[in-house]
């Protein structure tokens, strides 16, 4: 009984007097009303939904007219009381009509003036959730001043729920919490009652698609919590997305980013080498780097005189560190990249098959068939120290002739591809002799493929190689990939022709001139 009384008609003290004046007097004796009089005659029937029931209650000239006309309509149209008898539904629809009936209140409870007009709910009948949001049902809360709430510019003002949103679901109201983003945009929330955000009832059906939460001005001051573990993200980046809500410590004395020394960098033998660390001896990621940083790395500290050549650096910032030099490679692979036996394999080359540093890279670029000038019978005196300046090719730019190499004289360097007997053979390896996955490939790479290629090599005719190391096959079609990119992944084994760029341009010009002359003769 006390629970039902708790949700009964409870008015605020400031509106008690006004509510008492609004409560209608006991209905007078039944008299025929003149047709089309009162507020209802001006704005249509009492069931007109353009004006809520609050308008009829507080603006009607004759309160008894609005109450008598509206109570029957509300009782018949409300879906909240369809399971109750007609008499009970009419009583619950508008309890002010029962003002003259006596209401029992617990002893010691002060009965408000207007609250005495509310009839207690029958046994077994509970108030629904709609009664708490409808201003006019069961006297859930008073409606004075709610019209101003609809027209206020205050964003945090809670608007009352009107007839137009009666069919929409009701989600938890949590004043002071952030608005539920999904609810504001769609008017739905999959979390329902368990959602911890606020769900304003004034949001229209379908939500506000372009609604966005007001941006919060970031606060650079993070909380210091002595005794708590340090925030790892703050220690690394000096930022914390949780801000003042973070439960970890944010020490200010460690705000300055410390320069990581070589001894403090992580060693991860099972991971690939850190490329930047191997070239510069430093790593900007510090302890957060996931690659390996060996301590016994040796960086060249002085330039080395190699003939008349000038030491070239492997880094673009060579001007800032002139002491970092490298030894020019004696030979290059078919892609013009240096082959340096004993050096660490270039990780970028192993992954992508290319290297942005080209001939200046100081790492090894292995290939199944590397062209060694000594093995090919080329006079090594032609290969000067200026070989380091070459981006492509085997010899210096001064040698304008093509080196004619026969297949038996080509040095063969085997790459380390895994042999997995019982597994399927790697198709790409069997076709090209290369595998971009290297040791990580899960397929079989038979070693007898090398012997098969060596046996077939003497039967092949002489191959004329260009300065870039690609074969010249007169009469064959031009390699389409080479014509587009200037490179060829098949190298010397490609069956197409690889003409130099100058020859291609000259051939194109001559064909254009011939076509123009033909058109001129046809016109004449």
UniProtKB/Swiss-Prot annotation:
Residues 19-39, 300-319, 505-524 are annotated as: Disordered. The keyword Protein biosynthesis does not apply. GO terms for biological process: cell fate determination; flower development; mRNA processing. GO terms for cellular component: nuclear speck; nucleus. Residues 512-524 have a biased composition (Low complexity). Interacts with HEN4. Interacts with FLK and PEP. Involved in flower development. Functions in floral reproductive organ identity by binding AGAMOUS (AG) pre-mRNA and promoting its processing. Functions in association with HUA2 and HEN4. This is Zinc finger CCCH domain-containing protein 37. It comes from Arabidopsis thaliana.
């Amino acid at each position: 009984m006390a629970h039902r009384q708790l949700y009964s008609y409870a008015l605020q003290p400031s509106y008690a007097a006004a509510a008492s004046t609004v409560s209608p007097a006991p209905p007078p004796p039944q008299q025929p009303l003149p047709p089309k009089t009162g507020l209802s005659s001006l704005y249509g029937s009492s069931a007109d939904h353009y004006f809520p029931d609050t308008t009829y209650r507080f603006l009607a000239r004759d309160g008894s007219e609005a109450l008598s006309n509206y109570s029957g309509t509300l009782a018949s149209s409300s879906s909240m009381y369809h399971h109750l008898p007609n008499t009970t539904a009419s009583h619950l629809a508008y309890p002010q009509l029962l003002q003259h009936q006596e209401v029992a209140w617990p002893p010691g409870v002060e009965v408000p003036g207007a609250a005495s007009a509310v009839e207690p709910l029958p046994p077994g009948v509970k108030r629904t959730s709609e009664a708490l949001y409808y201003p006019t049902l069961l006297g859930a809360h008073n409606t004075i001043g709610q019209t101003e709430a609809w027209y206020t510019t205050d964003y945090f003002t809670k608007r009352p729920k009107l007839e137009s949103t009666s069919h929409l679901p009701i989600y938890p109201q949590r004043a002071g919490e952030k608005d539920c983003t999904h609810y504001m945009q769609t008017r739905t929330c999959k979390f329902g009652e368990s959602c911890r955000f606020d769900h304003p009832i004034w949001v229209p059906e379908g939500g506000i698609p372009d609604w966005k939460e007001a941006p919060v001005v970031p606060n650079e001051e993070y909380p210091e919590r002595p005794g708590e573990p340090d925030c790892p993200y703050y220690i690394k980046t000096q930022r914390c997305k949780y801000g003042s809500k973070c439960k970890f410590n944010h020490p200010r004395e460690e705000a300055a980013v410390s320069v990581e020394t070589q001894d403090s960098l992580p060693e991860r033998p099972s991971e690939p080498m850190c490329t930047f660390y191997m070239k510069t001896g430093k790593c900007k990621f510090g302890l957060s780097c996931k690659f390996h940083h060996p301590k016994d790395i040796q960086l060249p500290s002085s330039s080395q005189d190699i003939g008349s050549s000038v030491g070239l650096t492997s880094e673009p910032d060579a001007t800032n560190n002139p002491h970092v030099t490298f030894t020019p490679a004696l030979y290059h692979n078919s892609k013009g990249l240096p082959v340096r036996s004993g050096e660490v394999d270039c990780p970028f080359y192993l992954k992508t098959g290319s290297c942005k540093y080209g001939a200046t890279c100081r790492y090894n670029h292995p290939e199944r068939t590397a062209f060694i000038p000594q093995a090919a019978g080329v006079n090594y005196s032609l290969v000067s120290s200026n070989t380091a300046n070459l981006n492509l090719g085997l010899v210096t730019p001064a040698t304008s002739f093509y080196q004619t190499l026969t297949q038996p004289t080509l040095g063969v360097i085997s790459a380390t591809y895994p042999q997995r007997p019982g597994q399927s053979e790697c198709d790409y390896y069997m076709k090209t002799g290369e595998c971009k996955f290297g040791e990580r490939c899960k397929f079989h790479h038979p070693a007898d493929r090398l012997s098969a290629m060596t046996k077939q090599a003497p039967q092949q005719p002489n191959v004329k190689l260009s300065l870039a190391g690609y074969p010249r096959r007169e009469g064959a079609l031009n390699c389409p990939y080479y014509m587009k990119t200037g490179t060829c992944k098949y190298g010397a084994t490609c069956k197409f022709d690889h003409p130099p760029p100058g020859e291609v341009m000259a051939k194109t010009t001559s064909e254009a001139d011939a076509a123009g002359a033909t058109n001129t003769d046809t016109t004449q």
